[in-house]
Amino acid sequence: MAAILNVQRIQNNQVTEYTMSPVRNFANTKDVYFDAQLTNIESKIDSSRAQIHLTIALKYNTNLPDNIFQAHFSLGNWQSDKIQLQKAPDKKHDSLNSIKYFYAFLDVPRSALAKKEINRFSNVVARVLRISFRLQDQSEKGNWSDYHLFDTVASELYATVIKETINFGNMIKINALDGSKQLTSSQGSFKYSWTMYDYRNLEQLDEVRNLINISFDKPVQIVNVDVKIHYVPTKGRLQEIKQQGEFENNLDVNEKLKLNLIGNWNFDKHNKKLISDISGTGIFLPQGGYGSYEIMIGATVGNDFYTIIANNQFKYETPLDDLEQNDFFEVNYLPVYSTYNFSDLTQ
């Protein structure tokens, strides 16, 4: 367990005590002082500019001011200065897990995203967004009693880098398991809400069937859905399943689209892969394993077309049919020679 960091700030003869305690990182693999995760992306592009609205979850436990953390963004040929993250007023912080939500708004010249002539630039383009984190300007470092806090925390901030591909052309990207957002389009504003199951700790007979539930407070036409599933069975190799199709599905206001896995699947133990089987189940790895899925939904809201991308992960902690991993116990029965002192339960 990492130690609690203590520091004093001395300013105008006033001493303020600050502490920073370790927290569990988002991957739940180690204790850290700082971690970050991108939970939501919305992007729009026109003839001159690209606009990106990001929701970032920061994980830390300190009484230091929230503006101590800043972010640096790069996208295509564009780079930002250090940007002060804005607290998300409409998202409830998770105090139990030391998670706070922040917004960042990026306004990027379209020319910075083009690799060649801009007149050949497609209306839909993919670029990698890179986010790195820094502490606030260190010019006042001399006012602090212990530089060690800054050095320790700064090293973790510098190591925390988020890379995410953004597909421009009215895109909504979802990484969180649930939430709701208000989005402004050329047709006005609309709200969308979603939920995905937490499949990261599946038990022996659990299956992955429901992929996402999403609704809008405006009528929506679903045009196409693509699903990519990647999984690695225990002692197996990376496998991929692709499902795609064009269909017309009109959703009324606040009607929920419940998107499930198409078809049934069975696990081929010899080849260690999932195969289509009408009598099978959803995604089920009886020998254990892990994986992820990505959903891409094409939807029309008013006169605007949106690409909605959602990601989720799944993992089986304990194999069902691996004798080396399961526990068994033996019961030795002792003979009863007398019923003396036993109660007669048949009375």
Swiss-Prot record:
InterPro entries: DUF5443. Pfam families: DUF5443 (PF17518). It comes from the Bacteria. This is Uncharacterized protein MG285. It comes from Mycoplasma genitalium (strain ATCC 33530 / DSM 19775 / NCTC 10195 / G37). The lineage of its organism: Bacteria, Bacillati, Mycoplasmatota, Mycoplasmoidales, Mycoplasmoidaceae.
